[in-house]
Amino acid sequence: MADSQTAPLEPITAADGTPLKKKLAQALFRSRVRAVSLVVPLFAFVMASFVIPIIALMWQGVYNDRFSSHMPNLTEQLTMWDGLTEPNEKMYEALVADLKTARADRTIGRAATRVNQESPGTRSLFTSTARKAKKLKPPFKESVVKANKKWGNIEVWQAMKITSQDLTPGFYATALDGRYTVDQGFVRQDEKRQIYVKLFWRTMLISATVMGLCLLLGYPVAYLLATLPLRTSNLLMIMVLLPFWTSLLVRTTAWIAILQSQGVINDLMVFVGITADDARFSLIYNMTGTIIAMTHILLPFMILPLYSVMKTIPPSYMRAARSLGATPTMAFIKVYMPQTIPGIGAGGLLVFILAIGYYITPALVGGQDGQLISNMIAYHMQKSLNWSLAAALGGILLAGVLVLYWAYDKVIGIDNMKLG
């Protein structure tokens, strides 16, 4: 019997002769490309509307070339200066040359504004000297100081040296109630100029208070929604969602009418006899008004995450605890409440993050005591036009949000977050 030899297996091919394995790989690649192509528009939108603006915000807080771009000669001399010795003749000569050029180009105001941000009161010094720059003759140090004695103050030159640096920590130092100096680095501002840290703490306090009130008011409502019959709970859910159908501005303005001294609440308390007509409570244009209005506006953001978690808790757990001898209160605390922690965490995180960034409500009802850091950011963006300081304040606020997000992930876990 002849030895039989096994012939090698031929690879399985498609109709066109291409190996089937290669065909499958090509089909899988095409399906992946189609899947990715569907995500590309969303990715581009997120990058353009979220990631890139945040990166630009962070960059704006540490980069400002307004002085160096308009005063190039002086910037070069300031780079070589140690910041401690008296300014030399070359520095004054560069100052005069740049003042002439900046006045001719009508850009002196931009450079002066940048120095004024570091050393208030120097803008007029720049503009007044720029008008006399053509008449200044050598020796420039003597003629410039003669034109305005403030140029002999070394602190003015130190401020210019700091502003001549495009990359600077000065705005973040200001946002933390400090200032950046040539010789000492970061130092605290004078007591009367320390406003931002207090605003940060006030923002945190109000946000935490609003979060606590929303939890205190929202937990029973969410419990009712989760335990009542479907028909009744749907009606209550409509009441919870009703504020979303009304403009935020309208809701905030309504609280002004309710809380003002001649408003509904004060009139009712006078009518009942709780307070005298000449001793009405001040409930608006202060921290109290801010807390009340923000609690009302943010309450649904606490109720919905709580409701979504409570709805998944089987009622049999409570019945089992009762059957084992637990009182209703003990069963609720020991069995039911621990299962709602993901909802408490999600609602608390959502309300707190929304509260620390709120602007329109504190602006309308807050007055002087109820202003938050967001109002100061808006001020620097719209009125003082110090965008770099606004970016630094926003960057610190963003860092605080990221810390909260990290803490939530460590304590509860992002995987357990339920928002609805």
Q: What function would you assign to each model-found segment?
A:
Residues 70-73, 77, 363, 368-409:
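Interhelical loop and adjacent transmembrane-helix boundary motif
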Residues 22-23, 27-28, 56, 210-241, ...:
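Transmembrane-helix boundary motif in ABC transporter permease subunits
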Residues 27-28, 32, 233, 287-289, ...:
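Amphipathic cytosolic juxtamembrane alpha-helices at the membrane-cytosol interface
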Residues 284-322:
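Membrane-cytosol interface at the C-terminal ends of specific transmembrane alpha-helices
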Residues 1-37, 56, 60-197:
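Membrane-topology segments of multi-pass transport proteins
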Residues 21-28, 251-295, 365-368:
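Membrane-interfacial helix termini and adjacent extracytoplasmic/periplasmic loops
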Residues 307-318, 322, 391-420:
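C-terminal transmembrane helix and the adjacent membrane-cytosol boundary/short C-terminal tail
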Residues 41-44, 240, 296, 302-307, ...:
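Transmembrane alpha-helices
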